[in-house]
């Protein structure tokens, strides 16, 4: 091989390595993440031994869930309101009143980069958040993943009504934005990336919402992104997804051409 030929070959090999690394980085990394902020009027953590005892008395918690207290992926922390007055979430209009009444947020968090095979981590975190809220006389409970503020009464009624508190409708929120996009929040709790779609044509909004709802519900149930086409009105649709960051993807709704 001539020096020129060797050089060209080396360049192509190097480009191939770079491209392979780039494509590998573009693949979405697995992340299951649950995070609740229990908005407490106090500025310190309560006795967590009492919290654990209350959680273990719940009909929805058994020995399997109880073991998660010692799981290194589970964390409870304290965020002081006085030190986070300028945080964006504290100053959002829909949350401002609740934060003004709280001295701190008790953060209940579970994060896993290893694929999970059940929703027991979610069942556990929900009951821990409920127990803490009762223990401290909380102002509210903020679901950071689904971006939803629960009143304590509403949250306790939810737990009393559903001891197995892992249903899709209670954890995932699909919203249509002003720019004709859709946002799906909450799937990340079971290791499925949340979605932000590209703009949808106005006359296809209802169809898009139906397809996205079905995708989200099926992905939640299987704890894995749905890859099969979705059939509506005799047509097949797919969501063409692209990773943005761990736990989040952008998506475009496409009609699959008939064969």
What name fits each language-model region?
Residues 39-98:
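N-terminal low-complexity, intrinsically disordered segments
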Residues 74-171:
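Internal, hydrophobic cores of structured domains that mediate oligomerization or house catalytic pockets
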Residues 18-33:
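Transmembrane-cytosolic junction motif
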Residues 1-9:
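Feature marks short, highly hydrophobic, charge-poor N-terminal signal-anchor/signal peptide-like helices
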Residues 56-64, 127-141, 217-225:
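Structural alpha-beta junctions
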Residues 96, 144-259:
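Aromatic/basic-lined ligand-recognition segments
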Residues 10-17:
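Core hydrophobic alpha-helical membrane-spanning segments
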């Amino acid at each position: 091989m001539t020096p020129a030929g060797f050089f060209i070959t080396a360049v192509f090999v190097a480009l191939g390595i770079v491209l392979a690394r780039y494509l590998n980085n573009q693949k979405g990394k697995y992340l299951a993440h649950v995070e609740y902020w229990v908005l407490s009027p106090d500025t310190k953590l309560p006795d967590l031994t009492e919290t654990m005892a209350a959680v273990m008395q719940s009909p929805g918690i058994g020995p399997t869930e109880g073991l998660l207290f010692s799981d290194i992926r589970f964390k409870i922390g304290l965020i002081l309101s006085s030190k986070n007055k300028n945080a964006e979430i504290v100053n959002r209009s829909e949350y401002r009143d609740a934060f003004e009444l709280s001295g701190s947020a008790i953060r209940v968090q579970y994060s896993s980069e290893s694929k999970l095979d059940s929703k027991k981590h979610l069942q556990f975190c929900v009951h821990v958040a409920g127990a803490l809220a009762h223990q401290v006389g909380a102002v509210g409970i903020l679901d950071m993943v689904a971006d939803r503020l629960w009143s304590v009464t509403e949250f306790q009624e939810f737990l009393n009504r559903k001891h197995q508190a892992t249903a899709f409708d209670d954890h995932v929120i699909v919203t249509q934005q002003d720019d004709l996009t859709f946002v799906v929040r909450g799937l990340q709790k079971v290791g499925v990336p949340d979605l932000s779609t590209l703009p949808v044509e106005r006359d296809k909004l209802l169809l898009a919402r139906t397809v996205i709802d079905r995708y989200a519900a099926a992905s939640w149930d299987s704890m894995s992104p749905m890859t099969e086409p979705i059939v509506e009105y005799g047509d097949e649709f797919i969501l063409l997804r692209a990773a943005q960051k761990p736990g989040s993807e952008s998506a475009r709704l496409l009609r699959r051409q008939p064969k």
